[in-house]
Amino acid sequence: MAWQGLATEFLQVPAVTRTYTAACVLTTAAVQLELLSPFQLYFNPHLVFRKFQVWRLITNFLFFGPLGFSFFFNMLFVFRYCRMLEEGSFRGRTADFVFMFLFGGVLMTLLGLLGSLFFLGQALTAMLVYVWSRRSPGVRVNFFGLLTFQAPFLPWALMGLPMLLGNSILVDLLGIAVGHVYYFLEDVFPNQPGGKRLLLTPSFLKLLLDAPEEDPNYLPLPEEQPGPLQQ
């Protein structure tokens, strides 16, 4: 019964958040069970473009390392801030949300080539947190009960964790940079004098993912109108 309740709760999570979180968990579980190897997942341009192992363009965003503190920490922030974006500023705009993932993924992959980065899931997490924080400037965040600050400081606070653990912050900086590019092109530049939206979601994504808009001028035919017994 507990599993049924958990499954019901999970199915109530918005589609993009649910799909991405599940893909990350399943990928990590497959590696933990030795069904997959990280060497089959990491981004390698030679293997992608010469050996046509195109799945690496996606799988490098799904693996967050072995089960442990870092994995659960990343999953917590992926689930929380991806969901808040999808239920907040992207509510009813699934296609736009997916396009943000695609834009961020492509830009991170191109920039990751310069830094020889093999796994970019943490960068994607940083991008999600950054975009949410810039769109929620008045929200106060309680950081693990230790600090309280305004939302725009959250991405920088998160970057302090790998520094404390002695890890590189290059991936986090990449995610913040890509998040800022998206935020600027989507939220800042269109509101400037002479500015316009440069990031336009392809129409085929809208057809696939968004519910069709109702025509306000549409009048139902008589047989479509509720009768006395239906009212």
From Swiss-Prot:
Q: Which residues form a coiled coil?
A: none
How would you describe this protein's topology in the membrane?
Multi-pass membrane protein
Protein's GO biological process: endoplasmic reticulum unfolded protein response; ERAD pathway; protein N-linked glycosylation via asparagine
Show the SUPFAM superfamilies listed in the entry. Answer: Rhomboid-like (SSF144091)
Q: What UniProt keywords apply to this chain's record, in alphabetical order? A: Endoplasmic reticulum, Membrane, Transmembrane, Transmembrane helix
One cellular component GO annotation, for this chain's record?
endoplasmic reticulum membrane
Q: Which InterPro entries match?
A: DER1, Rhomboid-like_sf
Q: Which residues lie on this side of the membrane: Cytoplasmic?
A: 1-22, 80-98, 179-231
Question: How would you summarize the oligomeric state and partners of this protein?
Answer: Forms homo- and heterooligomers with DERL2 and, to a lesser extent, with DERL1. Interacts with VCP and EDEM1. Interacts with SELENOK and SELENOS. Interacts with the signal recognition particle/SRP and the SRP receptor; in the process of endoplasmic reticulum stress-induced pre-emptive quality control.
Please state which protein family the record places this protein in: Belongs to the derlin family.
What's this chain's function? Answer: Functional component of endoplasmic reticulum-associated degradation (ERAD) for misfolded lumenal glycoproteins, but not that of misfolded nonglycoproteins. May act by forming a channel that allows the retrotranslocation of misfolded glycoproteins into the cytosol where they are ubiquitinated and degraded by the proteasome. May mediate the interaction between VCP and the misfolded glycoproteins.
Protein known as: Derlin-3
Q: Which organism is it from?
A: Bos taurus (Bovine)
- Its encoding gene is what? DERL3
